[in-house]
């Protein structure tokens, strides 16, 4: 049982690492589309690419954010005394809250994604992509990175 609890304490670090890495991947890969040297081609192809690509990568979001929430909550309820004694409880709570805060950007993100998919502004969709990239980077720095750091602190304290 102790081994399972130790694993449970570490799992939010793993799942939030995946989320943070995905955000970084998005920034690096999607950022290619706004480079001046390919802007003309990007404006022609980005809406179709994004629409089809979104169907392929959305599973990462559908799986890993709820996993973060579930693991954060499970950690708060299993062996609570140990978490209180070590001070890890507040770090799991903060990690969970930062992870949930990612969703505060949901409507903004969906609006920008719709603009990309609908080629808005017409013929200059890279403008919308640039706005999405800025929002995504801000969101990663303000929610995903702190969640990851909090889950690391929690695991270090709990173990």
UniProtKB/Swiss-Prot annotation:
What keywords does the record list, in alphabetical order?
Glycoprotein, Membrane, Oxidoreductase, Signal, Transmembrane, Transmembrane helix, Virulence
Q: Which GO terms describe its cellular component?
A: membrane
- Where it mainly occurs, coarsely classed, is membrane
UniProt entry tagged with the keyword Signal: yes
- EC numbers, comma separated: 1.14.-.-
- Say which enzyme class the record assigns: oxidoreductase
Query: What's this protein's name?
Result: Probable epoxidase scpX
Give the bilayer topology.
Multi-pass membrane protein
Where in or outside the cell is it found?
Answer: Membrane
Biological source species = Mollisia scopiformis
GO MF annotations in UniProt? oxidoreductase activity
- Which pathway does the record list? Mycotoxin biosynthesis
């Amino acid at each position: 049982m102790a081994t399972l609890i130790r694993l449970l304490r570490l799992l939010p670090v793993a799942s939030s690492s995946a989320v943070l890495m995905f955000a970084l991947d998005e920034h690096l890969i999607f950022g290619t589309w706004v480079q001046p040297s390919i802007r003309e081609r990007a404006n022609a192809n980005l809406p179709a690419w994004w629409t089809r690509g979104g169907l392929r990568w959305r599973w990462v979001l559908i799986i890993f954010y709820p996993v973060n929430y579930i693991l954060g909550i499970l950690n708060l309820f299993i062996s609570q005394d140990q978490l209180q004694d070590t001070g890890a409880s507040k770090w799991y709570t903060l990690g969970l809250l930062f992870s949930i805060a990612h969703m505060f950007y949901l409507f903004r993100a969906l609006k920008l994604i719709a603009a990309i998919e609908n080629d808005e502004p017409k013929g200059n969709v890279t403008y919308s992509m640039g706005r999405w990239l800025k929002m995504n980077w801000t969101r990663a720095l303000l929610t995903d990175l702190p969640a990851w750091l909090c889950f690391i602190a929690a695991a270090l304290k709990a173990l």
